[in-house]
Amino acid sequence: MTFKSGFVAILGRPNVGKSTFLNHVMGQKIAIMSDKAQTTRNKIMGIYTTDKEQIVFIDTPGIHKPKTALGDFMVEAAYSTLREVDTVLFMVPADEPRGKGDDMIIERLKAAKVPVILVVNKIDKVHPDQLLAQIDDFRQQMDFKEIVPISALQGNNVSHLIDILSENLEEGFQYFPEDQITDHPERFLVSEMIREKVLMLTREEIPHSVAVVVDSMKRDEETDKVHIRATIMVERDSQKGIIIGKGGSMLKKIGSMARRDIELMLGDKVFLETWVKVKKNWRDKKLDLADFGYNKKEY
Protein backbone atom coordinates (compact mmCIF):
# COMPACT_ATOMS: atom_id res chain seq x y z
CA MET A 1 0.00 0.00 0.00
CA THR A 2 1.29 3.47 -0.90
CA PHE A 3 1.86 5.73 2.11
CA LYS A 4 1.14 9.45 1.70
CA SER A 5 2.21 12.40 3.83
CA GLY A 6 2.38 16.17 3.90
CA PHE A 7 2.57 19.32 5.99
CA VAL A 8 -0.44 21.64 6.36
CA ALA A 9 -0.37 25.14 7.92
CA ILE A 10 -3.44 26.62 9.62
CA LEU A 11 -3.40 30.41 9.18
CA GLY A 12 -5.85 33.15 10.08
CA ARG A 13 -6.61 36.12 12.28
CA PRO A 14 -6.74 35.69 16.08
CA ASN A 15 -9.74 33.84 17.52
CA VAL A 16 -11.04 32.25 14.31
CA GLY A 17 -10.90 28.71 15.74
CA LYS A 18 -7.54 27.36 14.53
CA SER A 19 -6.66 25.64 17.81
CA THR A 20 -10.21 24.33 18.27
CA PHE A 21 -9.95 22.73 14.82
CA LEU A 22 -6.58 21.15 15.55
CA ASN A 23 -7.72 19.75 18.90
CA HIS A 24 -10.84 18.29 17.26
CA VAL A 25 -8.79 16.57 14.55
CA MET A 26 -6.32 15.18 17.09
CA GLY A 27 -9.07 14.05 19.47
CA GLN A 28 -7.36 15.69 22.44
CA LYS A 29 -6.02 19.04 23.59
CA ILE A 30 -2.58 19.90 22.25
CA ALA A 31 -3.24 23.61 21.62
CA ILE A 32 -4.67 25.77 24.40
CA MET A 33 -7.85 27.75 23.84
CA SER A 34 -9.48 30.83 25.33
CA ASP A 35 -11.71 33.70 24.29
CA LYS A 36 -8.68 36.04 24.35
CA ALA A 37 -7.07 37.09 21.07
CA GLN A 38 -3.49 35.87 20.50
CA THR A 39 -3.84 32.87 22.81
CA THR A 40 -1.50 30.80 20.61
CA ARG A 41 2.04 32.25 20.64
CA ASN A 42 4.17 29.44 19.18
CA LYS A 43 3.79 27.21 16.18
CA ILE A 44 2.25 23.97 17.44
CA MET A 45 2.43 20.76 15.46
CA GLY A 46 -0.42 18.23 15.46
CA ILE A 47 0.49 14.89 13.89
CA TYR A 48 -2.49 13.01 12.42
CA THR A 49 -1.57 9.45 11.43
CA THR A 50 -3.56 6.57 9.95
CA ASP A 51 -2.36 3.35 8.31
CA LYS A 52 -2.43 5.14 4.92
CA GLU A 53 -1.26 8.67 5.63
CA GLN A 54 0.32 11.20 7.94
CA ILE A 55 -0.85 14.82 7.91
CA VAL A 56 1.33 17.14 9.96
CA PHE A 57 -0.76 20.18 10.89
CA ILE A 58 0.98 23.35 12.05
CA ASP A 59 -1.24 25.60 14.17
CA THR A 60 0.06 29.16 14.04
CA PRO A 61 -0.38 32.31 16.14
CA GLY A 62 -3.22 34.55 14.99
CA ILE A 63 -1.91 37.12 12.51
CA HIS A 64 -2.37 40.67 13.79
CA LYS A 65 -0.65 44.05 13.69
CA PRO A 66 2.13 43.60 16.28
CA LYS A 67 2.71 46.16 19.03
CA THR A 68 5.55 44.40 20.89
CA ALA A 69 8.60 42.25 20.14
CA LEU A 70 6.48 39.27 21.24
CA GLY A 71 3.89 40.28 18.63
CA ASP A 72 6.61 40.46 15.97
CA PHE A 73 7.74 36.95 16.95
CA MET A 74 4.19 35.59 16.72
CA VAL A 75 3.43 37.06 13.29
CA GLU A 76 6.77 35.98 11.82
CA ALA A 77 6.28 32.50 13.30
CA ALA A 78 2.94 32.29 11.48
CA TYR A 79 4.19 33.51 8.10
CA SER A 80 7.34 31.35 8.28
CA THR A 81 5.18 28.25 7.87
CA LEU A 82 4.50 29.24 4.25
CA ARG A 83 8.07 28.11 3.51
CA GLU A 84 7.57 24.74 5.19
CA VAL A 85 4.24 23.29 4.06
CA ASP A 86 2.52 21.63 1.12
CA THR A 87 -0.92 23.18 1.72
CA VAL A 88 -2.33 26.13 3.67
CA LEU A 89 -5.70 26.18 5.42
CA PHE A 90 -6.72 29.85 5.56
CA MET A 91 -9.36 29.97 8.28
CA VAL A 92 -11.94 32.74 8.51
CA PRO A 93 -15.06 33.05 10.71
CA ALA A 94 -18.48 32.76 9.10
CA ASP A 95 -19.96 35.27 11.55
CA GLU A 96 -17.61 38.22 10.89
CA PRO A 97 -17.20 40.19 7.64
CA ARG A 98 -13.88 40.17 5.80
CA GLY A 99 -11.59 42.78 7.32
CA LYS A 100 -8.21 44.45 6.82
CA GLY A 101 -6.51 41.62 8.70
CA ASP A 102 -7.90 39.07 6.24
CA ASP A 103 -6.83 41.20 3.27
CA MET A 104 -3.30 41.47 4.67
CA ILE A 105 -3.07 37.68 4.96
CA ILE A 106 -4.54 37.17 1.48
CA GLU A 107 -1.81 39.35 -0.06
CA ARG A 108 0.87 37.18 1.58
CA LEU A 109 -0.90 34.02 0.44
CA LYS A 110 -1.04 35.24 -3.15
CA ALA A 111 2.74 35.66 -3.12
CA ALA A 112 3.32 32.19 -1.65
CA LYS A 113 3.57 29.32 -4.09
CA VAL A 114 1.43 26.97 -2.01
CA PRO A 115 -2.14 25.72 -2.61
CA VAL A 116 -4.60 27.47 -0.29
CA ILE A 117 -7.87 26.00 0.97
CA LEU A 118 -10.33 28.52 2.42
CA VAL A 119 -11.88 27.12 5.60
CA VAL A 120 -14.97 29.04 6.72
CA ASN A 121 -15.38 28.17 10.40
CA LYS A 122 -18.22 28.72 12.89
CA ILE A 123 -20.98 27.85 10.42
CA ASP A 124 -23.11 26.87 13.42
CA LYS A 125 -23.41 30.59 14.22
CA VAL A 126 -24.89 31.87 10.94
CA HIS A 127 -27.85 31.45 8.60
CA PRO A 128 -27.01 29.63 5.33
CA ASP A 129 -27.65 32.84 3.34
CA GLN A 130 -25.02 34.69 5.40
CA LEU A 131 -22.60 31.82 4.89
CA LEU A 132 -23.07 31.89 1.12
CA ALA A 133 -22.48 35.65 1.03
CA GLN A 134 -19.28 35.22 3.07
CA ILE A 135 -18.00 32.49 0.75
CA ASP A 136 -18.80 34.58 -2.33
CA ASP A 137 -16.96 37.60 -0.91
CA PHE A 138 -13.78 35.64 -0.20
CA ARG A 139 -13.97 33.77 -3.50
CA GLN A 140 -13.58 37.10 -5.29
CA GLN A 141 -10.35 37.93 -3.43
CA MET A 142 -8.13 35.09 -4.68
CA ASP A 143 -8.16 31.71 -6.36
CA PHE A 144 -8.61 29.07 -3.65
CA LYS A 145 -7.97 25.39 -4.37
CA GLU A 146 -11.10 24.50 -2.36
CA ILE A 147 -13.60 26.26 -0.10
CA VAL A 148 -14.81 24.21 2.86
CA PRO A 149 -17.33 25.46 5.46
CA ILE A 150 -16.96 23.79 8.88
CA SER A 151 -17.79 24.04 12.56
CA ALA A 152 -14.62 23.10 14.44
CA LEU A 153 -16.49 23.29 17.74
CA GLN A 154 -19.24 20.87 16.71
CA GLY A 155 -17.18 18.88 14.21
CA ASN A 156 -19.45 19.60 11.23
CA ASN A 157 -17.71 18.88 7.91
CA VAL A 158 -14.28 18.42 9.54
CA SER A 159 -13.98 14.83 8.25
CA HIS A 160 -14.78 16.10 4.74
CA LEU A 161 -11.92 18.59 5.02
CA ILE A 162 -9.57 15.79 6.13
CA ASP A 163 -10.68 13.74 3.11
CA ILE A 164 -9.85 16.63 0.77
CA LEU A 165 -6.40 16.99 2.33
CA SER A 166 -5.84 13.23 2.07
CA GLU A 167 -6.76 13.19 -1.62
CA ASN A 168 -4.18 15.89 -2.32
CA LEU A 169 -1.32 14.30 -0.37
CA GLU A 170 1.61 12.95 -2.34
CA GLU A 171 3.46 9.70 -1.73
CA GLY A 172 5.92 10.29 1.10
CA PHE A 173 7.60 9.24 4.31
CA GLN A 174 6.07 8.68 7.71
CA TYR A 175 7.94 11.52 9.42
CA PHE A 176 6.87 10.71 12.99
CA PRO A 177 6.02 7.51 14.92
CA GLU A 178 2.32 6.65 14.75
CA ASP A 179 1.82 7.27 18.48
CA GLN A 180 3.39 10.76 18.45
CA ILE A 181 0.80 13.55 18.30
CA THR A 182 2.95 16.70 18.62
CA ASP A 183 6.56 17.84 18.30
CA HIS A 184 6.55 19.85 21.53
CA PRO A 185 8.03 18.38 24.73
CA GLU A 186 5.85 17.74 27.77
CA ARG A 187 7.31 20.78 29.56
CA PHE A 188 5.97 23.08 26.84
CA LEU A 189 2.50 21.52 27.03
CA VAL A 190 2.51 21.83 30.83
CA SER A 191 3.45 25.53 30.64
CA GLU A 192 0.71 26.13 28.07
CA MET A 193 -1.94 24.43 30.22
CA ILE A 194 -1.04 26.68 33.15
CA ARG A 195 -1.11 29.76 30.90
CA GLU A 196 -4.52 28.70 29.57
CA LYS A 197 -5.98 28.80 33.08
CA VAL A 198 -4.54 32.29 33.65
CA LEU A 199 -6.23 33.40 30.40
CA MET A 200 -9.52 31.84 31.48
CA LEU A 201 -9.58 33.40 34.93
CA THR A 202 -8.16 36.91 34.36
CA ARG A 203 -9.18 39.96 32.35
CA GLU A 204 -7.90 43.32 31.05
CA GLU A 205 -4.20 43.45 30.16
CA ILE A 206 -3.08 40.43 32.21
CA PRO A 207 -3.56 37.67 29.57
CA HIS A 208 -1.15 39.36 27.16
CA SER A 209 1.41 40.05 29.91
CA VAL A 210 1.80 36.47 31.14
CA ALA A 211 4.44 33.86 30.37
CA VAL A 212 4.89 30.53 32.15
CA VAL A 213 8.22 28.80 32.71
CA VAL A 214 8.45 25.22 34.00
CA ASP A 215 11.44 25.30 36.35
CA SER A 216 11.53 21.59 37.15
CA MET A 217 9.55 18.47 36.35
CA LYS A 218 10.49 15.13 37.91
CA ARG A 219 8.93 12.08 39.51
CA ASP A 220 8.96 11.86 43.30
CA GLU A 221 9.65 8.18 44.01
CA GLU A 222 8.19 8.39 47.54
CA THR A 223 4.79 9.75 46.52
CA ASP A 224 4.83 8.33 42.96
CA LYS A 225 3.71 11.74 41.68
CA VAL A 226 5.20 13.99 39.02
CA HIS A 227 6.43 17.04 40.92
CA ILE A 228 6.25 20.23 38.83
CA ARG A 229 7.51 23.68 39.81
CA ALA A 230 6.40 26.50 37.50
CA THR A 231 6.76 30.28 37.52
CA ILE A 232 4.11 32.63 36.13
CA MET A 233 5.84 35.75 34.80
CA VAL A 234 4.05 39.11 34.65
CA GLU A 235 5.16 42.66 33.85
CA ARG A 236 3.88 44.62 36.86
CA ASP A 237 3.43 44.24 40.61
CA SER A 238 -0.29 44.99 40.26
CA GLN A 239 -0.65 42.02 37.88
CA LYS A 240 1.19 39.79 40.35
CA GLY A 241 -1.31 40.75 43.05
CA ILE A 242 -4.28 39.93 40.83
CA ILE A 243 -2.91 36.50 39.86
CA ILE A 244 -2.13 35.60 43.48
CA GLY A 245 -5.53 36.85 44.64
CA LYS A 246 -6.84 37.42 48.15
CA GLY A 247 -5.07 35.02 50.46
CA GLY A 248 -3.64 33.21 47.42
CA SER A 249 -7.13 32.20 46.23
CA MET A 250 -6.65 32.96 42.51
CA LEU A 251 -3.26 31.23 42.29
CA LYS A 252 -4.71 28.19 44.05
CA LYS A 253 -7.60 28.07 41.55
CA ILE A 254 -5.22 28.40 38.57
CA GLY A 255 -3.05 25.60 39.95
CA SER A 256 -5.95 23.29 40.72
CA MET A 257 -7.52 23.64 37.25
CA ALA A 258 -4.16 23.28 35.49
CA ARG A 259 -3.23 20.22 37.54
CA ARG A 260 -6.36 18.35 36.40
CA ASP A 261 -5.53 18.93 32.72
CA ILE A 262 -1.86 18.05 33.22
CA GLU A 263 -2.81 14.79 34.95
CA LEU A 264 -5.07 13.89 32.02
CA MET A 265 -2.27 14.58 29.55
CA LEU A 266 0.46 12.73 31.48
CA GLY A 267 -1.73 9.91 32.78
CA ASP A 268 -0.08 10.44 36.17
CA LYS A 269 -0.82 12.05 39.51
CA VAL A 270 0.76 15.51 39.70
CA PHE A 271 1.94 17.78 42.50
CA LEU A 272 2.02 21.31 41.04
CA GLU A 273 3.72 24.27 42.70
CA THR A 274 3.22 27.68 41.10
CA TRP A 275 4.98 30.97 41.83
CA VAL A 276 4.48 34.46 40.43
CA LYS A 277 7.37 36.77 39.52
CA VAL A 278 7.58 40.25 37.99
CA LYS A 279 9.81 40.80 34.95
CA LYS A 280 9.16 44.33 33.75
CA ASN A 281 8.45 44.79 30.02
CA TRP A 282 9.55 41.25 29.16
CA ARG A 283 7.51 41.27 25.94
CA ASP A 284 9.91 43.82 24.42
CA LYS A 285 13.18 42.25 25.59
CA LYS A 286 14.70 39.68 23.24
CA LEU A 287 16.66 37.88 25.96
CA ASP A 288 13.53 37.50 28.08
CA LEU A 289 11.53 36.31 25.07
CA ALA A 290 14.13 33.60 24.41
CA ASP A 291 14.22 32.61 28.10
CA PHE A 292 10.43 32.22 28.11
CA GLY A 293 10.35 30.01 25.00
CA TYR A 294 9.80 32.56 22.23
CA ASN A 295 12.98 31.94 20.26
CA LYS A 296 13.53 33.17 16.71
CA LYS A 297 15.68 30.10 16.02
CA GLU A 298 12.38 28.23 15.73
CA TYR A 299 11.90 29.79 12.32
Curated annotation (Swiss-Prot):
Organism of this sequence: Streptococcus sanguinis (strain SK36)
Role this protein plays: An essential GTPase that binds both GDP and GTP, with rapid nucleotide exchange. Plays a role in 16S rRNA processing and 30S ribosomal subunit biogenesis and possibly also in cell cycle regulation and energy metabolism.
Protein name per Swiss-Prot or TrEMBL: GTPase Era
Keywords per UniProt: Cell membrane, Cytoplasm, GTP-binding, Membrane, Nucleotide-binding, Ribosome biogenesis, RNA-binding, rRNA-binding
Quaternary structure (record): Monomer.
Region of interest called G3, as start-end residue ranges on this chain: 59-62
Gene: era
Family: Belongs to the TRAFAC class TrmE-Era-EngA-EngB-Septin-like GTPase superfamily. Era GTPase family.
Residue ranges annotated for the KH type-2 domain, each copy included: 202-280
One CC-aspect GO term: plasma membrane
